[in-house]
């Protein structure tokens, strides 16, 4: 009863659970704090003891779980329509997924935003991790490997999600233009329905997939926290006042926690706590506001 009241509605299924969570600021805040506690415990150690050890296990596990989910996703009835949506030019308009093709400028802007975010450009991550490399490392080779690996993982992620979402929509008689193919609802509503439709094996694939999402989220969070931590630690070293890494990580995580709690409490706008006026992309919820600020303004300016 306590879990039902304060964390989530345990008697609900699929998208209903997600909707219940969004309207429960306390539950969202608790899970946010637990996530950031994990990040703190990983970051507070030396890089080789914390982040490096996590990634040595987490990244191969992520790849393996992604392959498992892809195999199941592309073998679902109707998955071929999702593959056409991804890889056949013009098919999204032809089949009715969207009314008209986006403009070239829109495509370039969207691809550019994805590039900056996916490769952690203009946010200090590459500089920070690069500073930990040996001087004997081949930077040109590493750059090519990173870009190729990132592109492959992006395509694999699409193969794990889009065909399954389209197949689920077809199975439920949902018109193509009403199938959710992006955003949190795709991840936490549509895909839950997909796993539920798989029968007895569905929960297993669901567990594997959401563990995959968790590992990806943790690896991204600890890398960005490390950027800020490294800045303060290195600045203290330059001033010949060595900083206590654990203490720096604690203060950085405390600041991140405050901002993260604002997003969690807002519940993607479901709680009605925050309302923004301005452009259409800024007025839905606090997460969209921060996303527009970071990807639309801060990251491009930082890159320049």
Q: What does each of the following model-derived ranges do?
A:
Residues 160-165, 226-233, 269-278:
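Re-entrant/interfacial helical elements at transmembrane boundaries that shape
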Residues 52, 56-222, 236-248:
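Membrane-embedded translocation segments of transport machinery
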Residues 1-48, 78-109, 184-188, 268-289:
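Inter-helical loop and helix-membrane interface segments of multi-pass membrane transporters/permeases
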Residues 217-223, 248-267, 279-282, 288-304:
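Hydrophobic alpha-helical segments of multi-pass membrane transport proteins
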Residues 1, 30-44, 60-73, 162, ...:
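Hydrophobic core segments of alpha-helical transmembrane domains in multi-pass membrane transport
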């Amino acid at each position: 009863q306590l879990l039902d009241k304060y964390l989530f509605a345990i008697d609900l299924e699929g998208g209903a659970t997600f909707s219940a969570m969004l309207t429960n600021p306390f539950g969202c805040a608790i899970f946010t704090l637990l996530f950031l506690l994990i990040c703190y415990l990983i970051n507070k150690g030396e890089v080789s003891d914390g982040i490096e050890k996590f990634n040595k296990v987490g990244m191969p596990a992520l790849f393996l779980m992604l392959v498992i989910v892809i195999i199941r996703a592309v073998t679902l009835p109707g998955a071929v329509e999702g593959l056409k949506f991804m890889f056949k030019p013009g098919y999204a308009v032809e089949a009715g997924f969207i009314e008209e093709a986006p403009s070239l400028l829109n495509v370039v802007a969207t691809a550019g935003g994805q590039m900056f975010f996916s490769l952690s450009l203009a946010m200090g991550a590459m500089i920070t991790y690069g500073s930990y490399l040996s001087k004997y490392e081949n930077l040109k080779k590493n750059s090519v490997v990173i870009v190729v690996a990132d592109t492959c993982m992006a395509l694999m992620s699409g193969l794990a999600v889009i065909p399954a979402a389209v197949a689920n929509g077809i199975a439920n008689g949902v018109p193509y233009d009403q199938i959710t193919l992006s955003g949190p609802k795709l991840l936490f509503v549509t895909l839950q329905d997909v796993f539920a439709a798989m029968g007895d094996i569905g929960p297993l694939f669901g567990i594997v997939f959401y563990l995959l999402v968790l590992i990806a989220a943790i690896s991204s969070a600890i890398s960005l926290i490390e950027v800020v931590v490294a800045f303060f630690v290195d600045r203290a070293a330059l001033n010949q006042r060595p900083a206590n890494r654990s203490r720096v990580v604690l203060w950085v995580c405390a600041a991140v926690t405050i901002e993260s709690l604002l997003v969690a409490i807002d519940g993607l706008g479901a709680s009605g706590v925050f309302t923004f006026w301005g452009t259409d992309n800024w007025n839905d919820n606090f997460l969209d506001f921060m996303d527009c600020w970071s990807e639309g303004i801060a990251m491009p300016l930082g890159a320049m």
